[in-house]
Amino acid sequence: MAILPVRRDDSYHQDIAERLIFESGRPVLIFPERPVRRLATSFANIAVAWDGSQPAARAVGDAMPFLRRASRVRIFSATDDKPMPSAARGREIAQQLASEGVDVIYEEVKKTDRHTIGSFIESYVADHNSDLLVMGAYGHSKLREFILGGATRSVLMNPPGWIMLSH
């Protein structure tokens, strides 16, 4: 695992972080160089951003040492008015973690139009005072991310605290 500081709105360091995430084959633990709030010294309250993707599943697997030691794990999915096909798998992951003794809940949270997926994730982490955000890193073309926004790039540009990313 690589541990790496990132600076808010610093594309040079964010590009280094992205290369490590997408090319190393290992999870990357990121923290803001100048955090807005005090960084946790242990990961007791963990948020897992779940979208049903292979990178999200890999992130959960990579984070197991942290998840087993946590006091509370919240797996959350962003929803809109349509049913989420990933919801069933999210509940299964939560049940599996619970069977291993992890204090875990799964919840689907409605994402409003005023939030990008990145700002939605950042708000969730802040609202639940999460010590660590675990999420899969998914890469889009730079043009698509520029137009639509991307969760990975967004949290790298504005890290809410400790983030563990896996691809």
For every predicted segment, state its role.
Residues 88-91, 119-122, 147-152:
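Charged helix-capping and loop-helix junction motifs
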Residues 12-13, 55-56, 85, 117, ...:
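Secondary-structure boundary/capping motif
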Residues 52-107:
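Redox- and metal-dependent alpha/beta enzyme cores, enriched for Fe-S-associated oxidoreductases
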Residues 3-19, 135-154:
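Glycine-rich, Arg-bearing micro-motifs that act as flexible, cationic patches
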Residues 124-130:
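Glycine-rich phosphate-binding loop signature in dinucleotide/nucleotide-binding domains
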Residues 132-137, 163-166:
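Conserved active-site loop/cleft motifs that coordinate metal ions or position small ligands
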Residues 107-115:
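Short beta->alpha junction loops
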Residues 1-76, 158-167:
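Intrinsically disordered or low-complexity boundary/linker segments at protein termini
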